[in-house]
């Protein structure tokens, strides 16, 4: 094995971090170009010069260059592919290509040797002018074999030492050994951990590691082990390195042909859980999402401009529970409805935005640009000269930081225009925002000497940025803009997005976004909406009847009918079985009660009448043939009466006499079924008027219903003047005494008469 090798074998009990969540911890090799940034570096001028391009014993082309730093020089050999990866890493983490003005090497790696050498000569000359303490990226420094103090280091993978390691770490605090078995550490050194021992909380924990990268000089060049010692040190002196490697485009092209669908789907489902955005570098978030301005910044600023013009915005704090709830939603990849949330607690939205910028590892105005900004601001120049120097310093920041700062400062400038309503001037906003946007770079000894002295300067420069945002942030380059670079007396187009969003595949987020889409409820509503629109456009008689029945419902009925079907089943899936049963029971009851065909329950009086009539079953029905037989006699021979002496004109006053024998009811109950007794209708003259009244019902629906025939179920509040067949309207009801005898009897059909007179 060579260097720090990977091993999946079970580790000793002294390595508690060997397994995480039941899965083996992958041991990273330092040669795999793990990506991390030093918290601070001490680099002077670094000179890089191309010596020659030669072929080695394997006929592989190697580019030899000389690196000079801290009055030392050494030779480094790299390939064309190494230079292309270095160029992309340099412009991903350190420089913007618009500021560095360096040619992109990846499209030029297939040039002839002489032409490519000329390109590299120009490249290294420009690179030597840009190097300095701004370079904190470990892969960039490793390419030049420079440590954090500007000295030369030889990676352990290129030496004869071979010690299995389980992790790599960077030293964050100096440590002086007190025993011979301990290591002497300095800030910026790299160690390869070989053993992670545990101890009680009251004791100090020591780890064992190999000093991989150090500023110590190798005394004996023949023995490379002298510069790489193994020993113990306190665990709080180092920080483990997470693997954030830049994907190699050459390897991606080779692997694209061999990738199958099963592996792609497995990777997709495995990576469905999104990483949080709080505490994530702006450049890393941009590489992941492709957005120059984070979504949380756009959403919060839009919500505050719409609903946050209130007193003390950004000064008053919101409710902590609401802030944590919003943060959890953004970290999970969701986008909460800030418009609805802002109506209740807009101060929580403003506090969330400040918390996001406060937790950035590298502040919005980066550590690298901090000295230049302070120096340009403190110069006693005119306003135009100060704006010009600050603009130049701002353009050196990474593009994600520059665009986000431009967006935020323009938002604060618009907010200052409503200072009469918010009581927040540019000075007040600067006092609130400056601690979240400006932080002095950390020092090697960990002493923040500029923290207190820089507070006033931070407030002043933030106030200046808010008042002059239109003049400072003007160099805005479009996403699709490209620029031409001269290469060997010709012009080649280099796309600006070649080092940014185009490096990631656009197809990686399509399928996961589909599976992480809206809920089943929303999908069901969308499908149902399409079916409804299709049914309305259809010209069939069935769809026409359905459309008419929907339009006859009132707005309140429609709203209640629709709300009964919007209960989400997904919410019930997270509860117990008892709650699911109760929810289904309530859901069915609500749906049943909201149906258009449902009728109100009958009154207690109607129920008692139905029960008494149905249980005794002793109602004698009127024979339709008898009614038809008696009525013609009354109409054709009105003078024939049982008492001819007292003849009275039948048109004067008419009554109905219905003879019902009480003894028949008792005999009917005793003997069971019996032939219905014939009911006679007679007309006689009388001095006293007897008027038969209708059987009134308490329910308006029951008033128009009958047991023998179904009627249309209509809203009685809208159709009071509609007379269904076999009924009369309320407004046209007249006493029976005003009708002729024939009209009186023809009005009541047999089934209708039996129902009315049986009550």
From Swiss-Prot:
Residues 591-624 are annotated as: Disordered. The record marks 315 as: Arginine finger. The keyword Protein transport does not apply. The keyword Signal does not apply. Residues 280-473 form the Rho-GAP domain. Keywords: GTPase activation, SH3 domain. One of its GO terms (biological process) is positive regulation of GTPase activity. It comes from the Eukaryota. GO terms for molecular function: GTPase activator activity. SMART domains: RhoGAP, SH3. Residues 612-622 have a biased composition (Polar residues). Functions as a GTPase-activating protein (GAP) for ced-10/rac-1 and CDC42. This is GTPase-activating protein rrc-1. It comes from Caenorhabditis elegans. The gene is rrc-1.
């Amino acid at each position: 094995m060579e260097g720090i090798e990977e091993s999946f074998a079970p580790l000793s009990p002294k390595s508690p971090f060997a397994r995480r969540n039941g899965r083996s911890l992958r041991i990273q090799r330092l040669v795999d170009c793990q990506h991390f940034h030093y918290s601070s570096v001490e680099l002077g001028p670094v000179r890089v010069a191309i010596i020659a391009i030669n072929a080695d014993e394997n006929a592989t082309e190697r580019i030899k260059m000389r690196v000079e730093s801290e009055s030392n020089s050494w030779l480094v050999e790299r390939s064309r592919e190494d230079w292309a990866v270095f160029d992309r890493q340099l412009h991903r983490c350190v420089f913007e290509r618009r500021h560095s003005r360096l040619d992109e090497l990846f499209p030029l790696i297939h040039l002839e040797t002489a032409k490519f050498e000329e390109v590299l000569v120009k490249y290294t000359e420009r690179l030597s002018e840009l190097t300095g303490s701004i370079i904190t990226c470990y892969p960039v420094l490793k390419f030049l074999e420079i440590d954090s103090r500007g000295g030369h280091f030889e990676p352990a993978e290129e030496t004869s030492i071979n010690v299995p390691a389980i992790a790599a770490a960077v030293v964050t605090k100096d440590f002086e050994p007190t025993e011979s078995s301990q290591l002497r550490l300095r800030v910026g050194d790299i160690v390869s951990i070989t053993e992670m021992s545990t101890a009680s909380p009251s004791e100090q924990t020591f780890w064992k590691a190999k000093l991989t990268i150090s500023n110590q000089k190798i005394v004996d060049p023949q023995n490379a082990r002298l510069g790489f010692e193994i020993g113990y040190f306190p665990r709080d002196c180092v920080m483990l390195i997470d693997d954030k490697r830049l994907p190699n485009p050459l390897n991606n092209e080779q692997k694209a042909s061999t990738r199958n669908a099963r592996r792609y789907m497995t990777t997709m489902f495995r990576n469905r859980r999104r990483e949080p955005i709080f505490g994530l570098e702006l450049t890393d978030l941009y590489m992941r999402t492709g957005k120059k301005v984070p979504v949380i910044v756009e959403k919060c600023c839009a919500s505050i401009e719409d609903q946050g013009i209130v007193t003390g915005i950004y000064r008053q704090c919101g409710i902590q529970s609401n802030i944590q709830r919003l943060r959890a939603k953004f970290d999970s990849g969701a986008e909460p409805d800030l418009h609805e949330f802002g109506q209740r607690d807009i101060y929580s939205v403003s506090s969330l935005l400040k918390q996001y910028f406060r937790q950035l590892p590298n502040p919005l105005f980066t550590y690298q640009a901090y000295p230049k900004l302070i120096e340009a601001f403190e110069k006693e120049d005119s306003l135009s000269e100060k704006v010009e120097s600050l603009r130049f310093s701002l353009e050196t920041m990474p593009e994600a930081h520059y665009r986000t700062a431009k967006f935020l400062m323009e938002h604060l400038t618009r907010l200052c225009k409503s200072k009469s309503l918010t009581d927040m001037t540019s000075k007040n906003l600067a006092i609130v925002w400056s601690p979240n946007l400006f932080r002095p770079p950390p020092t090697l000894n960990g002493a923040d000497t500029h923290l207190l002295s820089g507070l006033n300067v931070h407030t002043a420069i933030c106030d200046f940025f808010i008042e002059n945002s239109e003049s400072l942030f003007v160099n805005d380059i479009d996403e699709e803009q490209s620029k031409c670079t001269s290469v060997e007396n010709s012009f080649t187009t280099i796309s600006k997005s070649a080092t940014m969003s185009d490096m990631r595949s656009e197809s990686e987020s399509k399928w996961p976004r589909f599976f992480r889409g809206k809920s089943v409820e929303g999908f069901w509503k969308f499908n149902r909406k399409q079916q409804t629109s299709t049914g309305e456009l259809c010209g069939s008689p069935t769809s026409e009847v359905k459309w008419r029945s929907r339009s006859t419902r009132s707005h309140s009925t429609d709203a209640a009918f629709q709300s009964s079907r919007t209960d989400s089943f997904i919410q019930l899936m997270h509860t117990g079985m008892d709650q699911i049963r109760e929810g289904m029971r309530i859901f069915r009851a609500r749906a049943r009660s909201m149906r258009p065909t449902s009728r109100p329950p009958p009154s207690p009086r109607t129920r008692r009448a139905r029960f008494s009539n149905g249980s005794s079953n002793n109602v004698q029905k009127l024979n339709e043939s008898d009614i038809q037989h008696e009525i013609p006699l009354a109409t054709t021979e009105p003078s024939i009466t049982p008492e001819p002496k007292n003849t009275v004109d039948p048109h004067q006053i008419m009554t109905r006499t219905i003879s019902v024998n009480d003894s028949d009811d008792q005999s009917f109950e005793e003997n069971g079924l019996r032939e219905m007794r014939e009911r006679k209708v007679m007309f006689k003259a009388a001095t006293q008027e007897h008027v038969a009244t209708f059987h009134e019902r308490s329910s308006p629906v029951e008033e128009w219903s009958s047991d023998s025939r179904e009627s249309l179920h209509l809203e009685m509040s809208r159709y009071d003047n509609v007379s269904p067949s076999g009924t009369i309207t309320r407004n046209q009801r007249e006493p029976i005494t005003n009708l002729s005898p024939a009209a009186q009897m023809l009005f009541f059909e047999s089934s209708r008469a039996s129902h009315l007179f049986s009550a």
